[in-house]
Amino acid sequence: NKGGITEVSKIYDVIVLGAGPAGLAAGLYAGRSRLSVLILEKGQDGGQIAITDEIENYPGQIVEGESGPSLIARMTAQAEKFGAERVSDTITEVSLEGEVKVLKSAKAEYQARNVIIATGAHSRPIGCKGEAEFTGKGVSYCATCDANFFEDFEVYVVGGGDSAVEE
């Protein structure tokens, strides 16, 4: 323990930053390759998919009407089955110099030979009345993902960036 920071003595083969679908897949494949793996996530596992009520466009074996949290729970269990460790922590400093990479948070220091950054994306809520209440129930942040749910409905696109226009 160094100044309130716990040094994790283990040097992992791989540390994955992010426990969304990409991070969990990376952890799964690294674990299946018999590498020591640590998956670090600062928030809720799953990223944006964790707030999705129903998934219909994800490749693979999806249970009819499966929710984002359900799919992420299965993905997490699969990564852990192959040896990936999962820790909730917020990394505040990263040093990718040298053979051993160092990742620091307010409470711990982690080391790995390789780092995979899979921190994902996040939506930018606009803060209008009812937005939080109806997210996933009519308010969507991914037109490509959710367009099928809104067929034959009048929709509004809010945003001025490229993705708002393209979607």
Segments predicted by a language model, with ranges:
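Rossmann-like dinucleotide/flavin-binding elements
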Residues: 6-12, 16-42, 135, 141-167
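Helix N-cap at the beta1-alpha1 junction of Rossmann-like dinucleotide-binding domains, i.e.
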Residues: 44-46
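Core beta-strand elements of the Rossmann-like FAD/NAD(P) dinucleotide-binding domain
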Residues: 10-12, 105-114
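Short glycine-/acidic-enriched loop or helix-start segments at secondary-structure transitions
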Residues: 26, 49, 96, 126-128, ...
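Glycine-rich beta-alpha-beta "Rossmann" dinucleotide-binding loop(s) and their flanking helix/strand
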Residues: 115, 119-142
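N-terminal Rossmann-like dinucleotide/flavin-binding domain of flavoprotein oxidoreductases
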Residues: 50-109
